[in-house]
Each structure stands twice: as C-alpha cells, then as structure tokens.
Amino acid sequence: MKKNTSPILTGTAFLPDGTGCASPTSHYTFLPSEKVIVEKVRFRNRFRIEVVGDLYIPKNIDRSRKHAAIIVGHPFGGVKEQTSGLHAQKLAERGYVTLAFDASHYGESGGEPRFVASPDINTEDFSAAVDFLSLRD
C-alpha cells in the first residue's frame, strides 16, 4: 500500500503586506478606500463603558464646516470591522461622515461579561455616539 506523504497544513492564514507581517487592516473584512480617512475614536456611554469606533471622513470634505453624520451599527455578535464598517465606508465614499462602532461587550469596546447583547446598553451606545459626534469640532 502506498503511504500518503502529503503535508497537512493547519493554522490561520493571512495576507502579508510585503513586510512579512499582517497589514494593520488585516482584521477588516473589506479593503480600505483611497477616498476615505478613517480615525479611531473612543467615547463613554452613560454606563461608563468605553465604546470604540471608526470615524469615516471623505478625503475631499470641507473641514471648516459642520456636516451631518450617519451612525452605522452592527448586528448582534458583529463588530465594526465587518458589515457596519463596510457600509460606513461606502457612505463616506459618497460624501457622508459616518461612524461605525463596536457595541458595548463586543470587539474593542469595553463591558463585562463579553459577548452579551443588551438592548438597553445598545440603545445607550447609539445615544452616546450621537452625543460624541454632536460635540466634535
């Protein structure tokens, strides 16, 4: 009988950025846009939980004026590097300022225990996001 000598590969694959390391955006499920600037932002909700988000700003926007913004949330169990970030980026490419954030207890945001869905806290996260954006210069 012939023995199978094919190697078995296990582990996690990643796409290198040319330096042999994973790129800083490798945890996103979509490619970054050349038309958009992304800023990491942090703010607290009224439960004092730190909420972490990505603010998507069109590169050609007039920063001397205030602009309307769209807040994009993720489904329960998701994070900002997935669908909500993609939607936020696509809207920013069309000229809107957008914010995609990790809900409390998920992703980079705080909150214990982890991976708990609370409609009350989730609603407060959106309220805190509105407050954060309205107070921003």
Residue ranges and their predicted role:
Residues 72-75, 100:
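Structural cue for short, hydrophobic secondary-structure segments
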Residues 18-68:
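N-terminal cap/lid segment of alpha/beta-hydrolase-fold proteins
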Residues 4-7, 12:
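Positively charged N-terminal leader segments that act as targeting/secretion signals
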Residues 83, 116-137:
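Alpha/beta-hydrolase active-site loop
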Residues 67, 74-79:
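Active-site glycine-rich loops that stabilize anionic/oxyanionic intermediates
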Residues 77-89, 103:
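The serine-hydrolase catalytic nucleophile loop
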Residues 90-110:
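Conserved alpha/beta-hydrolase
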Residues 82, 105-117:
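Glycine-rich "HGGG/HGxG" loop immediately N-terminal to the catalytic nucleophile
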